[in-house]
Amino acid sequence: MLYPTEFDVIVVGGGHAGTEAALASARMGAKTLLLTHNIETLGQMSCNPSIGGIGKGHLVKEVDALGGAMAAATDEGGIQFRILNSSKGPAVRATRAQADRVLYKQAIRRRLENQPNLWLFQQAVDDLMVEGDRVVGAVTQVGVRFRARAVVLTAGTFLDGKIHVGLNHYTGGRAGDPAAVSLSSRLKELNLPQGRLKTGTPPRIDGRTIDFSKLDEQPGDLDPIPVFSFLGRAEQHPQQLPCWVTHTNERTHDIIRSGLDRSPMYTGVIEGVGPRYCPSIEDKIHRFASKDSHQIFLEPEGLTTNEFYPNGISTSLPFDVQLALVHSMRGLEQAHILRPGYAIEYDYFDPRALKSSLETKAIGGLFFAGQINGTTGYEEAAAQGLLAGINAGRYAQEKDAWCPRRDQAYLGVLVDDLVTRGVSEPYRMFTSRAEYRLSLREDNADMRLTEVGRELGVVDDVRWDAFNRKRDAVSRETERLRTTWVTPKTLPADEATALLGKPIDHEYSLAELLRRPGVSYDGVCGLRGGECGPSEPLAEDELLLAQIKEQIEIGIKYQGYIERQAGEIERNGANENTRLPDGIDYTEVRGLSFEVSQKLNQFRPETIGQASRISGMTPAAISLLMVHLKKRGLGRRKGADSVPGADVQADNTAAQQ
């Protein structure tokens, strides 16, 4: 039957990508339908019970700055919070949290059920409705047809998923859930380029059978306790729990080696490529054969369960080998395994067949997000889902697509890497992937993205008001520090010596003092000489005050580096954002080699910047492209005339940093 209501956007899948996509399009005012095979698994953490980390935490902050749910749900469900790289520079500091699976899932579902313009429906999708070269809806397994202007597909590992434990295997999207076999077959009929990837998960352990007296305790940060969302509060956190650390040993490695003849990875049963940066324990002992041991983190799954997640022993070895390797480690000699580890193979589609909006180039209105694009990780999925949801909503509203640039967000880096370079293995975000990481910090994600999010319609009044208070306070106080001066007469020698190590010998602004190594904002404002402290409190809320102080310190201490990077961004920006016409035939560009023109015609980059990052492209080829565009009056800047926030982001680069 044809469902009587027509929707603007249909989102298929209720994982981290699907939930963010549905919430984003609904926040924009698009009538949105979220189709999931099981409402009870909305927002489920299928693998590790944690959010964030290096690069990943940056993505979560950006999702939050654009009104997404992941950071706020983590604050409500997080049972341990840490700042990684806290002793290093601000560019690589990152938030990571352990989450109670049940509390996190409840927080996501609560937001879905209370979001205006969003409807939920429990049914697996078996087919897409395609008319000509555009999608017009989806068909469920019982034949219900839903029509929509745009469809976002967030299928995770479910597309023709196959689960492996030793040499045994069976179809499944994850343990306990069916695979999407019919939908996978339908997508293959559409002739979209695809392949197979693989990921895995470790066995789960009953905490009552762990000897914690033999393990090293790893507590979270307590002073202060971090929060993930810019609107978060430490008071939202439930009870905090420690993690625990054990290690593999030579006996563990011998047990693993003895089972490789029954490993699906080492016997050719698994064809898909696994994640390089989250390898199975089989891969670890093979790739790092010289290492005598590997750290294993025992992470609690929640407050109301005894289940522990042993981070570091993802495996698809036979269960008897899994049991032996677990028992070989200190503290786990008597451990009971609750669930076996397994590997899962699944279909993905070459992201080079996508536009930067995450819409497929071949089928109008069809968007892909998450593991279907070859990525791995909750955070990468959530970021893509949010972008796909925004652009599906804009597509339904007949507005131009939006995507941040590489110098504006890690989300921009992620998408640009996917659509220009593709993937040969599951893609994971790192800070090292960003050229301008000093400008793309966790602390300034809101300064970079919240204003454009407001224009896109995904930032609500509460977030907007909080952002404006913070931005105004940072601007006002930074200006005060730059224009307030102290002299040897107004700053007593003993105070100067306590702060700087010696008295001052001439006039300094407070900003110049703050720029000195080891000098903090509080230290400068605590000086009695002159008018050093602010005339009024920067914020009544302690968390907001801490965020303001951090922004001020980083902005002043790293001002020279940030300005240098801003200049580099400006110099590279002209060519980077020059659009390439949709219908251009690259074989007609004089001087291009056959190989280069063939690649350009195959991958159809949207901008000169994207073209420059395609494998095999040379500076000479880019110059020929620029000459071709100039001669024919083609190409235009990607930005102000087509999407919200382009003017704002260009004009306020310094303020964002």
UniProtKB/Swiss-Prot annotation:
FAD binds at G13, G14, G15, H16, A17, G18. Its cofactor is FAD. The keyword Cell wall biogenesis/degradation does not apply. GO terms for biological process: tRNA methylation; tRNA wobble uridine modification. NCBIfam families: mnmG_gidA (TIGR00136). NAD-binding protein involved in the addition of a carboxymethylaminomethyl (cmnm) group at the wobble position (U34) of certain tRNAs, forming tRNA-cmnm(5)s(2)U34. This is tRNA uridine 5-carboxymethylaminomethyl modification enzyme MnmG.
